[in-house]
Amino acid sequence: MTNRDDELAVLTRGLDQASTLLGSVGDHDLTSPTPCHEWTTAELVDHLVAAPAKFAQMVRGEEVDWSGPTPHVGDERAGAFRAGADELVEAWHGVGDGDAPMGPDWQSAEIAVHTYDLAAAIGHPTGELDPEVAERGLVFMKANLTPENRGPVFQPEQPAPEAADAYQRIAAFAGRTVTPSR
C-alpha cells in the first residue's frame, strides 16, 4: 500500500464514523450549541454534510465556492453525507499521485474536527471514535496550520486536558475549548 492508500483508508473510516454519528442526530439536537460557537448543531450538520462533495470537487481540480451558504439538508443528513463521502472516495480513486492539491489527510483533519464538534454537541463520547482519524488529521494540521494562516476559521490553539483523547487534542489545536471527558 502507498502512503496515499493508507491516508485514503483512514479517511474512509473517518467518513464512515461521521455518517454513523450524523445518523444519530435527532431533531431535538439541532438547536444545541457546538464547540464552533458561531454554529448551532443544525448549521454544523449542514456544513459537515456539504464538505465531502466539495472536497471531491477539489480532488478533481474543480473550482469550489466555500463562501456560499450551505443548503439545509433536513432529515436526510446521513444519506446526503454518505452520497458525498462516496463521491469523495471515488474521486480519490480517479486521480493520479500528485494530481490533487493535497492528500486525503487534509480531509481527515477537517472531518475529525467536525466529528469532534458534533460528538460534543450531541453528547457522544469521543473516546469511542477511531483515534487514527484524529491522530493523522492532527499531524497534518500541525504541519500545515500555522498561526499566520489560521484565518477566521480556526481560533488560536487552546490547551488540551492532560488525559485528552485524539479528538480532544485535534479540537484544541483547531482552537476549540475542550473540557476533560467524564
Give the positions of each predicted feature.
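Structured surface interface patches that mediate subunit assembly and partner/cofactor docking
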Residues: T2-D6, V10, G14-Q17, S24-H37, ...
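Extended, alpha-helix-rich binding/interface surfaces that flank or overlap catalytic cores
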Residues: L44
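Glycine-rich loop at the start of a catalytic domain that most often binds anionic cofactors/ligands
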Residues: L48
